[in-house]
């Protein structure tokens, strides 16, 4: 049967990150997995620490839920209109990394998007990573912070092609670039994200109309982990 490995991330800076991750899991699994025909749900992380997530979601059974052993795993079974929903009793969690990124700078939209789609497919094929944006590509790459106090991120004006003339010398967009696409890579550890980054670069580098591959470096505001896009002698920092 087809399956999918899914990762959920919450920012480390949240003081309630453990509780926030559990809430996110409960909402996503109940709305998007429990409701989907023929699905079951299992945890890839065994041992401590863990959430008793299966028990909480099993309350959907309204008293008809029961514990069992299926596929040599301790699970909760929930009777549903489509048959049964099976879910592991415990779901483990651990530290990971968010926010590895690549920028694909193209002569026009088609070139940038074509390169980004190639990069996204290659990165997504790397075990242990996810690309959290639709199709793996973000057209609205952002900077940390905003002139508005209620916003935590905003458009990166210095790299917007349509703002080149308005910003004048403040524009940081290289000559000839007409569009910038970004891919974001989250993963289980730095080495895994680095491997996905290199796979993405190899897949995209020969795209016609691709002028540059770079990455967002936000002055250390997004984290202390760095992935180098090039070997010694020409390093470019990508924050995670």
Language model regions located:
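Short acidic, S/G/P-rich loop/turn micro-motifs used as interaction or catalytic elements
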Residues: 14, 190-191
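Short polybasic linear motifs
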Residues: 235-240
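An N-terminus-focused feature that recognizes amino-terminal "leader" regions
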Residues: 1-6
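Conserved mixed alpha/beta catalytic, RNA-binding, or beta-rich assembly cores of soluble enzyme
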Residues: 8, 12-13, 23-180, 195, ...
